[in-house]
Amino acid sequence: HIVSCMSAVNVINHIDREKYDVVIVGITEEGKWLYVDSVESIRDESWRDKSVGAVFSPDATEKCVLIERERGVEEVPVDVAFPVLHGLYGEDGTIQGLFELARLPYVGCGVLASAVSMDKLYTKIVADTLGVRQAAYVPVMRGELSHMESVTERVEKHFSYPVFIKPSNAGSSRGVSKASDRSELENGLREAAKHDRKILVEEMIVGREVECAVFGGGNGEVIASGVGEILAAADFYDFDAKYYNEESRTVVNPELPGDAAEKVREAARRIFTAV
């Protein structure tokens, strides 16, 4: 949740206020929607206490945010939504579905693309179909953990340790762990199962970790950014290493052998187009 707030501050600060009127709506961890009157209150985390209730109307004829005022409910018209929500409900097609219901234009991918991209298992199935190389994996369902020995034997049949365990549908490396033996594998499976009913166990690949952003418009053009190399200040790029360890960093356009960078960008474009 705090990551979403940090991202929202960055986005809002880069919007030209001379061109756009910004209506800020925050959602608490409990799911309460609030009208936020300043970026500063997000930055100092006081917005939960200082804000008033707000409701986004799904009425396609209204396209507005309803704000609770002492004198009554104020209707604030909205032309476009810019969701800045990490993880469940924000990146998985849920909030996108609400905007579709209201017929409100919004920034970002649509319902299906968001849902598929958020779910690691489905994304891997797409990558397999495209022939994009990726880490080998074994899918595990939460219900299978009642027969833990059978699950661990299946994993050990495919991989040697260490392996990575991930909830299929979760963000920011939540619930992700690395296992070097069976005991750690069992603990990692139980932890991942707290976040999703689908779990992935992946082989460990020793190498350099890189990332690439992709975006496209309605004209069909798909643009891939330059490649960034992740240098995690930890054993792997977990939640703390991503957001709290200041020694973690990303090198923009690192030196990579041959045409490796372009291969990364092309694979990213292909998957983006497919989903």
Label every model-predicted segment.
Residues 1, 268-275:
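Short, intrinsically disordered, charge-balanced linker/junction segments flanking boundaries
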Residues 1-107, 111-112, 116-118, 122, ...:
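ATP-binding N-terminal substructure of ATP-dependent carboxylate-amine bond-forming enzymes
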Residues 2-9, 75, 114-208, 218-219:
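Active-site nucleotide/adenylate-binding loops and adjacent lid/helix of ATP-dependent enzymes
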Residues 35-37, 147, 175-176, 213-214, ...:
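Short, well-ordered secondary-structure micro-motifs
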Residues 87, 173, 230-234:
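Glycine-rich phosphate/pyrophosphate-binding beta-alpha loops
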Residues 105-109, 134, 224:
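Short hydrophobic/aromatic-enriched beta-strand-loop microsegments
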Residues 180-266, 271:
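Phosphate-binding site of ATP-dependent enzymes
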